[in-house]
C-alpha cells in the first residue's frame, strides 16, 4: 500500500514544529541535500549579475556551557513553549529563523552569542 501525496501532506500538517524540523533533517541526510543551500541552475550569460542576498537563515550550531539561558533566549526568539525550545536547542545544529533580513539576523546572532551559544548566519 502506498500513500498518496495528500495523505503525506495531511500527516505532516498534524506534526509539531519539532517533528517537522527532525523530518527535514532526516530527509536532508537520506537524500544528501541541504535545504539551506538549494539553488537553481541558470544558463551562463555574458554579463555577470551580482545580486545582494536579502534573506538570511540563522543557525544554532552549538549551545555552549550555558544551556538554560540559551533555551530562554530561543524561547523568546521563536515563541515556542519551554519543552519545544529545549528540544530545539538540544538538537543543534538547527535552523532557528529562516528568511529574515540581515539586521535581524545579526541582532539574533549577537543575542545568542551573549548567552554562550554558537551561531552562524547563511
UniProtKB/Swiss-Prot annotation:
Keyword Ribosomal protein set for record: yes
CDD domains recorded: Ribosomal_L7_L12
Origin superkingdom: Bacteria
Gene Ontology MF: a single term: mRNA binding
One annotated GO biological process: translation
Presence of keyword Transmembrane helix: no
InterPro entries the record matches: Ribosomal_bL12, Ribosomal_bL12_C, Ribosomal_bL12_C/ClpS-like, Ribosomal_bL12_oligo, Ribosomal_bL12_oligo_N_sf
Cellular compartments per GO CC: cytosolic large ribosomal subunit
Keywords: Ribonucleoprotein, Ribosomal protein
Subunit structure comment from the entry: Homodimer. Part of the ribosomal stalk of the 50S ribosomal subunit. Forms a multimeric L10(L12)X complex, where L10 forms an elongated spine to which 2 to 4 L12 dimers bind in a sequential fashion. Binds GTP-bound translation factors.
Free-text function comment from the UniProt entry: Forms part of the ribosomal stalk which helps the ribosome interact with GTP-bound translation factors. Is thus essential for accurate translation.
Similarity section: Belongs to the bacterial ribosomal protein bL12 family.
Protein name as it appears in the record: Large ribosomal subunit protein bL12
Organism of origin: Blochmanniella pennsylvanica (strain BPEN)
